[in-house]
Amino acid sequence: AVPTLVNDYTDGLLDLTVELAGNERRPSEMRLEAGLFDGETKIFAETRDVEVFDSLAVVELTAEVPDVNPWSAESPSLYTLVITLADSRGRVLESVSSRIGFRTSEVKGGRFLLNGKAIYLKGTNMHEHDPVRGHTIDEALMLKDIRLMKMNNINAVRTSHYPQPERFYELCDEYGLYLIDEANIESHGIGYHPDITLANRPEWLGQHMFRTVRMVERDKNHPSVIIWSLGNEAGDGQNFVETYKWIKGRDESRPVQYERAEKSTRTNERHTDIWCPMYPSIERVESYALSEGQPGFDRPYIMCEYAHSMGNSTGNLQDYWDVIEKYGILQGGFIWDWVDQGLLETSEEGEEYFAYGGDYGEVGSPSDGNFCCNGLVGPDRTPHPALTEVKKVYQYVGFNPADLTRGLVTISNKYDFTNLSYFTINWEVLANGILFRSGNLRQISLEPGDSLTVEIPWGDIAPAPDTEYHLNLHVSRSDEWGIVPQDHMYASEQMLLPFHAAAKTAASSVASVAAGASGEESLALIDTRTEGSDLTFAGEGFEVVFDMAAGVMKSYRVAGQELIMSGPRPDFWRAPIDNDYGNGMEKRNAPWREAGGRA
């Protein structure tokens, strides 16, 4: 079934191909009925009389369905398609059903469009992983993943690096997640050189094609699958040109992508519809956008992997999205990755922990250490701090100060298909962190992509001395939104308010000294003296000594007591994090570790 949208994306078009296999030598007269249901209501039905032989019979049906509810991750509207085969006397022989969604997925004018609209893919990569069962996951864990993603504004998953269990696709159809479905093809270890990669060896075409066909034929009816991926890190060559061509001939309703397709040295045949690099720098991302219109820079740019979230990481995510939201050709990316692949173990002391490379086998066994633990959540789906950052950066409601002295704030609706009238915006003013005023803005009607400046009605504020005022904004829904519980907070913002009590008017002590003031209100003059390389500043009850040769403070005494063992020195080093070790930073920047000691 290929359900798409026509007539300015308002009506549905259902192209249905049914294959019938007979088991008798003589033809059998059959009746085929296709019915489409919206809930319990049948909105379309068509019947065909067919003759079925022992060979395959193909029946094609096309129908236009007016005023359908389009499927999207924000509004995953599904219809039930029921196909029934009966004999000539009307007895039902077989009946099958499938839940389908009407939507379009295409690349036009250098943009990836869903239902005719350029959208952002705020995605993550995901491996199958259970901390106890390993690669075997059940429906409860699938639902937990989907719920967590939706609660943290993630709208897309790349099924790295193989198709997921079919039930996962059904749940993504139902609750709304965009999927890049990736063929189970990776030959990273072979190497990428055109002379050795399996992608260029004709004897491996069959295996490339087999895995591609299997994925497409199994998953083709799922509306959540919006893009096909030819594989991952498997080099590039003619085999991928052929699998690309096969998909485009079999399914015209989705784009196809492959990261290595832009790195081929043996073929000039284009075989990716999307420019989908791995781990580009922010400068490289912007460079692509600035090159739009030049040869080769005419496709949407969606990173298939970025923001490697291993350990203490994901810190520059906002910097990426500042650039992404600046240029139309940049349309998001997929964080690496969703879940740490640790396994639950119990220590000799009876404490549970998550084990990874190095915890198994004899000492010295080959291991990638904790390289399998680079997720936004732990193996048990406990969120890491990075997920909080992802939720904030990916949020769909933006706030910017317009004129905070008058309480004016500009609200932007970054949803693709959802009006903000479904949400409540709660606000609160804090005085030194303590609640001072609060209220809410209900039913602000704001269409996707629009902005509106509103007044926050906090009234008159008489600033208190030594008090900081902040405005907090929170966006929530009072109802359940699919799999997300009611009253969940989807977006937030904090702004420092420009309210300050008038400063006390008093002449500064420094000014008094400079003017030669005397008496109790003046400070005692600081004594300065030099002895060798020592420069000393002394005043009432204190003394500070600097070593001018070394350029450091060597002594700080108060009331005759020494307060320091040695003075501060410049430090140009920080503790490396996991991603630093991954790219050799601790070796590359080693001279800076000792630079402070030589300063």
Where are these regions (language model features)?
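Secreted/periplasmic carbohydrate-active enzymes, especially glycoside hydrolases
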Residues: 1-166, 171, 175-176, 211, ...
